[in-house]
From Swiss-Prot:
It comes from the Bacteria. It comes from Burkholderia mallei (strain ATCC 23344). Together with its co-chaperonin GroES, plays an essential role in assisting protein folding. The GroEL-GroES system forms a nano-cage that allows encapsulation of the non-native substrate proteins and provides a physical environment optimized to promote and accelerate protein folding. It is an enzyme of class 5 (isomerase). Belongs to the chaperonin (HSP60) family. The lineage of its organism: Bacteria, Pseudomonadati, Pseudomonadota, Betaproteobacteria, Burkholderiales. Forms a cylinder of 14 subunits composed of two heptameric rings stacked back-to-back. Interacts with the co-chaperonin GroES. The keyword ATP-binding applies. This is Chaperonin GroEL. GO terms for molecular function: ATP binding; ATP-dependent protein folding chaperone; isomerase activity; unfolded protein binding. The gene is groEL.
Amino acid sequence: MAAKDVVFGDSARAKMVEGVNILANAVKVTLGPKGRNVVLERSFGGPTVTKDGVSVAKEIELKDKLQNMGAQMVKEVASKTSDNAGDGTTTATVLAQSIVREGMKYVASGMNPMDLKRGIDKAVAAAVEELKKISKPCTTNKEIAQVGAISANSDSSIGDRIAEAMDKVGKEGVITVEDGKSLADELDVVEGMQFDRGYLSPYFINNPDKQVAVLENPFVLLHDKKVSNIRDLLPVLEQVAKAGRPLLIIAEDVEGEALATLVVNNIRGILKTVAVKAPGFGDRRKAMLEDIAILTGGQVIAEETGLTLEKATLAELGQAKRIEVGKENTTIIDGAGEAVNIEARVKQIRTQIEEATSDYDREKLQERVAKLAGGVAVIKVGAATEVEMKEKKARVEDALHATRAAVEEGIVPGGGVALIRARTAIASLTGVNADQNAGIKIVLRAMEEPLRQIVTNGGEEASVVVAAVAAGKGNYGYNAATGEYVDMVEAGVVDPTKVTRTALQNAASVAGLLLTTDAAVAELPKEDAPMPGGMPGGMGGMGMGMGMDM
């Protein structure tokens, strides 16, 4: 085990604060509409230019172990805020730096760090309650577009695209971001339920131009086992043929003579069918089959429910208006399921989302809700170069997270104004002793900092603007993009409440930990082994002489 360096008290804190400042100073220049760019070196290819705070934070690794600890703690603030709210990483970093900086002054003057932390926590809890009061619901397309634009570093085209996507697939719909093929951004919307399984044989294709199989007004047979014996399928195939409608078979697999017979019937025009594998694996496959059954108004033919293929009737089959089956995807449009049943299923899955412990499970459950409740929209990001594409794609993903957060918890005036208003409301808050009061003061000072930084990045005098905004009321604030004092909500400068709340809570949490740190343990740098000795000196008189006359 390598030897460790143990540092105590002020020495430990001072080094960690240096790391906090290095990281925060690099990140905070990106804040606001006039935020500056940061250039990140890449081990191969050209450098990346970004205005995304979390991208900058992730790149920073310091040589000094103690400085690096401080930097990593603030990096945690940025990434946690990004994970929870999708945006607000730079705001969180600025808040954390301010709380640490002000807090260290009080700790150095001999105040009790634990009481300071209690004061900080008390002020943050009161500020969060105040933010909830200021918050208003985000419902209109215009508001959603504004949130998206602000989060994408004041790019209104990204905000408009996200608002359009949410309008098409609903607030719960799945919106994914992909690399585009052209210079312009594009929006593709898939209505209905889509899952990532395609036809089992290209002979099912009936639209050669698009290379898809299209079934109009089909029945849907859902089975949770493999189908290889055609005799099991014959009774239900005969009933479907009599009804004169096409059939989609979704099963664990369709193989052997069963698949061959379906293909032959399809080619001869006797019965139009398409077979696809069921989506997902294991328990998730059963759940997704159940989802499709509810969407199409059918039942899953499974032994557990006492149903068998041989005895299946048309009543157990689902129905849809139209189904498109491609090489890799199947889309069910306008299933015949009852709206009441679909809503009940969505409610059930939402309960599972709340109880889910892993991010992966939560994401998969949210996808299922979206497929049942809305549809799927794909935003294809267009750019001229690979570097621009990566940077723009990251901004679109940030903006998408932020708009979801806004729909979830509402919006507050942006540009640091919400924190100034919350600050005014809790200015009279007091703790049980002078040290706690100092902790409250630390938070009150920190809540000005995002506005100060936005103004500084815009090249204006921060103190003048902060005083002017603090003297105002409601949504009155400073729009750094235009350099004017306006009603921030009317001007479209808004932030999701969740983003501002999460940034403040995470910043205070990590800053509080730093202030109450009294020892730091880091690995000692390894000493390089001495270089091996050089070759011995040359061999005396072995020059050109060698005793010969030249």
